[in-house]
């Protein structure tokens, strides 16, 4: 039975948007991610999934793997990607990510950067002005920015990436030519190792390889030099 308000039970997606979202433009939550590789640029689709109860109590469920933003990666390109550019996240989640990283610092260091959300906002502005996901690693860049803001030396090793909430870590969904998900998760390197046989098979299929060329393809599939940078579009 419905209440007097006929729309009471209807889902309103706007309720999921925080107060700051009104100030965002589409570039804050892009539909695609542009990744630089040694062979050129890859444009990868992004998928957004909202699973606020994922991983409650420390459980690593399938929902936890999907909570947040996930890059859609064709299996052929999996070994061309490097994890570092993806740590920057999309612009719309970067402030929350930087806040979480500041809160992950040991207490003796963290007390120099309070309130964390305000420091994170200033840090994000500096990161956007002076650094780029395409050329710079997030953690060392953030350490330098925090030192500039507060005059306190922060070693990159002081940040605890494992303490960052799962939804703030970029996810990856690896798909075959039929768009079937072959593997997914937050750890790109683990996926590359887990799917090395699938990578080899996809390369062989795409190139129509004979046995004489398999050795070269195996070396490519296992070597995966990795891309140098990327960013959300």
Name these PLM-found stretches.
Residues 1-233:
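A positional "C-terminalness" feature that preferentially activates on distal terminal regions of long
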């Amino acid at each position: 039975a419905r209440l007097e308000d006929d729309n009471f039970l209807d889902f309103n997606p706007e309720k999921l948007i925080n107060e700051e979202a009104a100030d965002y433009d589409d570039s804050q939550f892009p539909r695609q991610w542009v990744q630089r590789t040694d062979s050129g640029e890859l444009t990868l689709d992004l998928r957004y999934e909202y699973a606020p109860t994922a991983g409650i109590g420390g459980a690593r469920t399938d929902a936890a793997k999907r909570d947040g933003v996930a890059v859609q990666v064709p299996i052929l390109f999996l070994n061309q990607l490097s994890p570092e550019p993806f740590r920057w996240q999309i612009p719309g989640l970067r402030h929350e990510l930087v806040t979480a990283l500041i809160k992950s610092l040991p207490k003796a260091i963290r007390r120099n950067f309070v309130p964390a959300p305000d420091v994170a906002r200033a840090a994000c502005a500096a990161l956007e002005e002076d650094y780029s996901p395409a050329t710079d690693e997030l953690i060392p860049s953030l350490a330098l920015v925090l030192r500039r803001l507060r005059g306190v030396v922060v070693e990159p090793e002081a940040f605890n990436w494992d303490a960052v909430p799962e939804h703030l870590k970029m996810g990856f969904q690896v798909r075959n030519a039929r768009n079937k998900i072959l593997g997914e998760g937050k750890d790109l390197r683990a996926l590359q190792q887990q799917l090395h046989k699938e990578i080899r098979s996809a390369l062989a299929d795409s190139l129509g390889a004979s046995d004489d060329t398999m050795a070269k393809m195996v070396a490519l599939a296992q070597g995966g030099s990795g891309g140098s940078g990327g960013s959300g579009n």
